[in-house]
Regions:
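Acidic-and-aromatic substrate-binding clefts and catalytic sites of carbohydrate-active enzymes
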Residues: 78-91, 111-121, 148-152, 187-193, ...
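Active-site acidic/histidine proton-transfer and metal-coordination neighborhood
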Residues: 16, 23, 89, 102, ...
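Acidic (Asp/Glu)-rich catalytic clusters
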Residues: 35-39, 68-73, 87-105, 124-136, ...
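A short, hydrophobic/aromatic-rich structural module that often spans a beta strand
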Residues: 84-111, 160, 188-195, 264-267, ...
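Histidine-acidic metal/acid-base catalytic patches
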Residues: 2-26, 30-43, 48-58, 62-72, ...
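A cross-domain feature marking catalytic cores of carbohydrate-active enzymes
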Residues: 44-48, 81-83, 105-110, 142-144, ...
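Active-site mouth loops of central-metabolism enzymes
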Residues: 48-62, 110-122, 154-157
Length: 317
């Protein structure tokens, strides 16, 4: 990915609604939201807020409390942070409760393609997961790190076998804790006939390794192909436990989630048809060429409203 100074790869590599509920209820009524739209739990990932804040020359790390308040103001119910240590959970817990924001999922980095590093990585995730479960987390999302962030290298077959084995071991241990592991990808895993992506699915047990479908990374990684995205959905739809939501127009990310290159209405219909209602996480970020018309809260407010319309059928009574 090219674009913002803090791009997804550097972010992942270096980044060491009680108060808003009533207001959202009023906004929902004013915008004509149905009861199902209001009941839908919708979360957002940390990454979009970092790039929106950076674009506005604001320091994301200056006040986590401010970030959570902005999330609540946008009408979004949940937050999916990138967690690198158990201490972060200790910091997050009281603030989540104060600002009325849930944390049903977290995102963690892992290095799993090297046998000598996989055990350490698994241990770190399990320590984080134990803390996170205590504050309401049920899904652990991981994107096994590439050989080099932003590099052209692809993993060998042997490395893919090591990674799949480690991913399943992690999934089994998380399952024993009452948690679910959800595998995530970026574009690099779609290289070379998507061999890395497919082996993480085919080479692991669906009971212990589920899929965090990042629709736009699949779309972009396969050459901006909706055909490839919906083929992935056909192949692995029953394994989807989390769905990352991002949109583009003419292959450039938009400020707010809406109509665009990916037909999310068709995607939602397919998942409902097969009886799958995953955890929904907005990840509508900006990049080079994205419009610059909205502040972070307004952009997420619009994303929130559109997502609730498209995925209204996913609300759990």
């Amino acid at each position: 990915m090219t674009g913002c100074t803090l791009n997804r790869r550097s972010f992942l590599n270096t980044l060491g609604m009680a108060a808003g509920g009533a207001a959202f209820g009023l906004r929902g009524q004013a915008s004509g939201m149905s009861q199902h739209q209001n009941k839908l739990h919708l979360a957002c990932n940390q990454y979009p807020w970092t790039v929106f804040y950076q674009r506005d020359k604001r320091n994301f790390d200056a006040s986590l409390d401010t970030v959570l308040q902005d999330i609540a103001r946008s009408g979004i119910n949940g937050y999916e942070p990138l967690v690198t240590s158990p201490a972060q959970i200790d910091q997050l817990g009281p603030l989540l409760k104060k600002d009325g924001v849930e944390m049903r999922s977290i995102y963690v980095n892992t290095v799993l393609h090297k046998a000598d590093e996989a055990d350490k990585s698994i241990g770190q995730v399990l320590a984080i997961a134990g803390k996170a479960k205590a504050v309401g987390t049920s899904i652990i999302v991981t994107n096994p790190s590439p050989i080099r962030w932003g590099g052209p290298e692809s993993k060998t077959d042997d490395q893919l076998k090591v990674q799949a084995d480690a991913l399943e071991r992690l999934g089994r241990q998380l399952s024993a804790m009452g948690l679910r592991l959800s595998y995530h990808n970026h574009d690099v895993e779609l290289r070379n006939a998507a061999r890395e992506f497919h082996h993480m699915m085919v080479g692991t047990d669906p009971k212990h390794v589920t899929l965090c479908l990042d629709a736009h990374w699949v779309y972009r990684g396969s050459g901006n192909s909706s055909v490839a995205l919906f083929d992935i959905l056909e192949l692995y739809g029953p394994r989807v436990t989390e769905l990352h939501l991002r949109q583009s127009v003419n292959q450039v990310w938009t400020e707010a989630f809406g109509d665009g290159d990916i037909d999310y209405r068709a995607l939602a219909k397919h998942l409902l048809t097969i009886g799958i209602k995953p955890h929904l996480v907005l990840e509508q970020a900006v990049e080079q060429g994205s419009p610059h018309l909205l502040d972070p809260v307004e952009a997420h407010r619009r994303s929130n409203e559109y997502a609730r319309q498209v995925f209204a059928g996913f609300a759990v009574d």
